[in-house]
Amino acid sequence: MNKLPLLNHPVAQQSVFTPAHLIKSVRRARQIPEGPIPKLCFLEFDGDLTDWLVAEGLARPFPFWPCFHTTMFAVEIEGVECGIIPRTIGGPYAVLVAEQLASSGARLIVGLTSAGRVSRELPLPCLVVVTGAIRDEGTSLHYLPAAKEVSCPAPAVADLIFRELAAIGRPVRQGKVWTTDAPYRETQMQLEWWAAESVLAVEMQAASLFAFGIAKEMAVVSVAMVSNAVDHDGEQFDTGSLREELRILAACVRAFKGVPAEIGLANRPAEPGESPNI
């Protein structure tokens, strides 16, 4: 047996503790009523957009979300009620919440993250619809056997989102990202290494979420707002106005509405303790 626990996870075995167990306890402890959650949910890792939506009266707390750790807000965009959860940063936290979203009835999870530039060919700021991620983190190893990369589990949906984002006039690319658990341990050697392998940006969630999506047959897409770079002398961390970020959500909604039947966002197989068609 390999002595590294992270490389020994029995990914083919059933979990003994499931989201359904936690959801039941949350509803009982917090007196949260039963009810469906939105089919399209956003994980908004920075949190500023959610704060602005709430302050503007565009989003409200969602009463049926069963979670000890987060608050879901409901926002209606182009006639579609969406869920948005802020600040679930990092692979473990993002996947913990994604598990509960899937168990509660979500059909598409979109992660919206800020990111750092790796490829010098990328303009700043720029959007990246993530097609795959380097697995330089730990969470994905609990869902899939060890490998260098993981692909987006919903590539057709990601393509639709890319087209809708391109239509709003902001710079947007499709490509790979490097997912890290330790942003303050990025080195120049690593940046050059991954740039040589056509990686566009670095962030903290995509590989973990993609591995979860593949393992649990859940549609997950990641959109990175690339806003900073160690070799950039201009404005750093500029993702545009919050109203422009709302346009990103609207583009995702249009893609969600346009998913053709042959692609579909069908009900995923029920986990132990879940209802089969929530």
Question: Over which residues does each language-model region extend?
Answer:
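Accessory terminal and edge-of-domain segments that mediate assembly/interaction
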Residues: M1-L108, R117-I278
